Amino acid sequence: MNKRTRRILPQMAVPLLALAAMPSLASTALVLHNANIYTGAALTPRAEAVVVVDGRIIYVGSGAEALRQAPPDARKVDLGGLTVLPGLTDSHAHLSGIGWRELYFDLTGVPSLAALQQRLRERAANDKGAWIVGRGWIESRWSPAAFPVRQDIDLVVADRPVVLERIDGHAIVVNSLALNVAGITRDTPNPPGGEILKDPMTGEPTGMLIDNARPLVEDLVPLPTDSETKLALETGANRSLRVGWTQLQYAGTTDTEIRLLCELYAERRIALRMYAAMEGPGPDAERFLTMGRGEKSCDDRLVVRGIKLYMDGALGSRGAALLAPYSDSPESVGLLRNEPDVILRIATEALRKGIQVETHAIGDRGNRLVLDAYERAFAAVPVSQRLVAEPRFRIEHAQVLAPADIPRFAKLGVIASMQTSHAISDMYFAPSRLGPDRVKGAYAWRSLLDAGAIITGGTDAPVELGDPIIEFYAAVTRRALDGYAGPDWGLEQRLTREEALRLLTYWPAYAAFQEGERGTIEVGKLADFTVLSADIMQVPDARILKARVVYTIIGGEVVYREATAQER
């Protein structure tokens, strides 16, 4: 997803401020007992109780022994058989984007162009701002499954610029006035790494702007104030707690957002752990690269250690860079948003400074170019010259891979940061984009694992809903939420439930250099837990989606509790 911020209506902020309240414990000690605990640890995979003191686990095992070891003032919670997992981690998400989705014009799930137009009509009647901005539409299940064009928007709103972002964050549709304000005409050339879609008959711009063409309009949208951005960050963080995340790995942030996050932590308005990468290339990322690794921050729940880069665009908007043309658009092979030498330069310097690099790559060409750049950087900076010997560079998404590149992840020590929900969302258009042979290398979780790679699981929210239960379900079923799986949709790539759990717990901790602190329920580790109403490791596939988050616990503190939860 591209990082773009939006102005929201100030009056929308008022009812959401209540979400900031952070429940706190009267005691620093906590006992969870009569529980169904999956520790994620190889030697003792199951337990029935855990004891926490000062934010860390001091005992894991039987209920009777836990009660004996607990300090006298410990808060004791009888979970009545609820399932406890190591605190779940979203290893790829966009925090402010989650908040903006909650706060402004959300088009997620609109079933048709007509429905989008009706939603826009309603919005225009109530939004008197100079611009109308929204996000979340996807055309793949419309009839016909075609991108909207500026005339579709003009029919509803012609007197103000309108910018509507596709759900993948890599394309927008705008109305004619927005094109005029930006000075985009039939003669405007495509910017490097972007495309201005034009009508093949008239040569006029259609209103669809892909990847690096988006800023031609988006840079004209009024920027949000600090208070609006702060509210978006707070809303995104607290929404993440409600769905069970204990850490979010923020794929592309800014100096401004880091400053605002520090304020939110100091004001006790957020509790979510974060592991962040600076958005690059750009001035903030370059300053970070010059400064070197900055793991220490304003709060021990916030770590800034990486730089996020982009190689290509998205598959749905045909910006993903492919080795051969799109099967449904033979004139296109996608886009390169940055030249490989940019990735190589930053990766090489990052190795010397101890900074992790994570690069967005979706198409098979995009992934190959990133692997090539990483390999060249590793060769240029031997271990003796690195601040961190094992850099754990990542490729974000790794969606479409040529068979020859799958073993390279393990060989190079590159982590595949993947989002299993993408497979069940994209199954409606990926086969037509890729064709029957190339689609076999798409969302290739099993192939990567069998080749020795490490996969870390995230959501890419707000591109996807951002729900760990959906990610777990998608990993083990590779089916849509209604149970549908397209023909030849690669069900052999499914994961076991144990692997799916590691995808959301231990492997994200490893990807953040935190496997000694988080990712399993073991003595000495941070007391981060996600407590569910159902045993997702055992129930039938269809019942996984019925599981609810009852508690989210971070450092032994209950930071979210379901309203109906009854403590015993």
Question: Residue spans of the language-model regions?
Answer:
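His/Asp/Glu-enriched, well-ordered alpha-helical/loop segment
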Residues: 231, 348-356, 365-393, 397-398, ...
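Bacterial N-terminal signal peptides
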Residues: 10-24
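Divalent metal-binding segments
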Residues: 27-33, 42-290, 296, 305, ...
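Extracellular/periplasmic ectodomains of large secreted or surface enzymes and adhesion receptors
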Residues: 561-568
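Short solvent-exposed capping/turn motifs at the termini of beta-strands
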Residues: 38-39
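N-terminal secretory signal peptides that target proteins for export/translocation
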Residues: 1-7
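Short, well-ordered beta-strand micro-motif
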Residues: 51, 197, 531, 553-555, ...
